[in-house]
Amino acid sequence: MATIDLVRHAEPDITIHDDFLRPLTSAGRRQTQQLVASLHQYPYTAFFSSPLKRAVDTITPIADDHGLPVQKNELLVERKMPAWLPNFSDYVNQQWQDLTFFEKPGESIHQVQERYLSFLYGLPSSAFVAVGSHGTAISSLVEAAIPGIGYHFFSKLGYAAVTRIEMHAGNVVHLAVWEPKSKTFKVLK
């Protein structure tokens, strides 16, 4: 069974509108150090990341702690947006109401879901990996595993959150979220 810990990037500096170059805030860098301590105990065999700076900067200290490199993968980018949207919340609501909705040159929640699933299907069945990721992408996988809860999950997902997916024969068999207070994973499925 493959185990994938999807690590949402820590708090980004949203004053930087360039999606690829948006860095973490000082609070985000502190969140990353908390992740290093929380995830130190897990025997990861590989680290992957979206190539976006905020995801790479979140996962790299964890990979460094494990003595492993980070492999950037284009399949792991955040949902492609048509542009910087002043009405972001309205756009997001519409996308979660209709998983196929998007404005060009962006992409739909369903397209993000398919892209991420193709990455997961390519992992070895014995993989234990951590992935530097994004809120919409992670929530799209939750939606695939438990239809109807993706938007609610997205609306509650904090920065530097960890979502664990366990897959067997191409199916999500377990889904859990990291609970920092109890320092354990809470099972959703």
Where are these regions (language model features)?
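Active-site-proximal alpha-helix that buttresses catalytic centers in soluble enzyme cores
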Residues: 2-72, 94, 100, 104-107
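Generic beta-sheet signal
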Residues: 4, 126-136
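Short active-site segment of divalent metal-dependent hydrolases/proteases
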Residues: 12, 137-138
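Acidic, low-complexity terminal tails and accessory targeting/binding regions
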Residues: 38, 68-72, 78-90, 125, ...
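Glycine-rich phosphate-binding loop signature in dinucleotide/nucleotide-binding domains
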Residues: 41-43, 123-127
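Short beta-strand scaffold positions
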Residues: 49-50, 114, 132-133
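Active-site signature of alpha/beta-hydrolase-fold catalytic machinery across serine-
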Residues: 61, 140, 144
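Internal catalytic-core helix/loop-beta-alpha segment
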Residues: 98-125
